[in-house]
Regions:
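Ligand-binding clefts of soluble mixed alpha/beta catalytic domains
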Residues: 1-405
Length: 405
């Protein structure tokens, strides 16, 4: 099986098992012998609790092997799926990855691709471009060159625990943040750069699900998952955030959620995201940086999300429904006889936002633990993560939850 190389090594000091298909040797075609080598890597990873990195560059399978080839693919899929949630799995696609091989690669926790790589389940090779895979949310990181793609895989490994029994990795040196102080109205990326250690945010799926920003960052040296929800959260963004939170939960990585969103665009996907947050037992700290109304608050920040700590900026707005609808529902009679109904309506909405929808009101009712100023966000989040680092939760015995998929 010279068309594939397997072994182990250290990535930034972290042990890992690896396999790499060689597209220049028989096209890297999958065979029974190659499958046995790869399956052995997965079995060793399971025994030792070590991450697996697979480098894909193969034209497909050896058709001459017929049923043996099908069985070989099936064994790899089964072993890989059984390893899911036990050790991190990263696929690095540098060349063709077509048909069943694509199923194996896409089943990893994260998929990193170079610009010229191909990834599709269609054996004809159609719709296989890296850009298409990124647009569909299958590719998490797309880089121009093979070298850049491999470097991103290295950064991912450094951000992740070795297995599901280890805690979140922490840097030897405490990180610092030199970003400008936060101010009201800051966008998601500005908030993230202001709470994360300098140059540590590694974004995933940037061009999929535009109303959710996800990725890993260091906060005072501790690795954590970051989710920033904004605007109206569409279906792709719900799926993107849900899968990311599920990964963090599987490996006990703390999740910091930043919320500035008005609502959901898809009930089905909103249910998926809500179930994910509610079920996750990892450390969860939420900061409402802007708007958080009704279902969004309940699903991502409130008791329904099972958040450990929920904080809000003093300028934030928390309400069962949008302030515009709530103000008219409660105070519409105050517009009777108004000579300027449009202007007076705006005043009523603003009054509702600064009174009943204010975070101080939510804190008084026990729905928020702390009201903070923007420039306190990094320090407050880090302190909460530190205090919650010993969190332990017991769950009911069951095979798994039946969430919307």
């Amino acid at each position: 099986a010279a068309e594939a190389v397997t072994g182990f090594g250290y990535i930034n000091g972290c042990p890992a098992y690896l396999f790499a298909q060689d597209g220049e040797t028989d096209g890297g075609a999958m065979s029974k012998a190659q499958a046995n080598k790869i399956r052995k890597i997965y079995e060793l990873a399971l025994k030792t609790g070590t991450p697996v990195v697979g480098i894909y560059d193969s034209i497909g399978g050896r058709l001459a092997e017929g049923g043996d080839m099908l069985a070989a693919y099936g064994e790899i899929l089964r072993t890989s799926n059984n390893l899911s949630g036990v050790v991190p799995q990263i696929s690095v696609v540098l060349g063709p990855c077509i048909g069943t091989s694509a199923l194996i690669a896409a089943g990893a926790d994260f998929v990193v691709m170079s610009e010229k790589a191909e990834l599709t389940v269609e054996t004809s090779g159609e719709n296989s471009s890296a850009e298409e895979a990124e647009k569909l949310g299958i590719c998490h990181i797309l880089e121009k060159t093979e070298e850049d793609a491999i470097q991103k895989a290295r950064e991912l490994i450094a951000a992740l625990p070795q297995n599901n029994l280890e805690g979140a990795p922490a840097a030897d040196l405490l990180g610092d943040c030199s970003a400008e102080p936060l101010a009201e109205g800051a966008d998601a990326y500005t908030v993230i750069s202001s709470i994360a250690d300098d140059h540590t945010f590694l974004e995933l799926s940037r061009n999929f699900g535009a109303s959710a920003v996800t990725g890993f960052a260091r906060l005072r040296g501790l690795s954590a998952g970051i989710v920033a929800l904004k605007d109206t959260i569409d279906a792709d963004s719900c799926s993107k955030a849900a899968r990311f939170v599920r990964f963090c939960d599987a490996f006990s990585l703390p999740v910091v959620t930043l919320v500035n969103a008005k609502g959901f665009a898809s009930l089905r996907e909103a249910s998926k995201l809500s179930s994910t947050y509610s079920e996750a037992t990892t450390v969860k700290v939420t900061v409402v940086t802007g708007e958080s109304y009704g279902p969004v608050y309940i699903a991502t920040a409130g008791r329904g999300a099972n958040a450990d700590i929920t904080m809000a900026w003093a300028s934030a707005s928390v309400s069962p429904i949008s302030p515009a609808a709530a103000a008219m529902f409660q105070w519409n009679d105050r517009l009777a006889g108004s000579t300027d109904p449009v202007g007076d309506r705006k005043k009523l909405i603003e009054e509702y936002k600064t009174t009943q929808a204010s975070p101080l009101s939510a804190a008084a009712d026990g729905y928020i633990e702390d009201v903070i100023s923007p420039d306190e966000t990094r320090d407050k989040v880090i302190r909460q993560l530190d205090m919650l680092s010993g969190k332990r939760v017991s769950t009911l015995p069951k095979k798994h939850s039946n969430i919307q998929l």
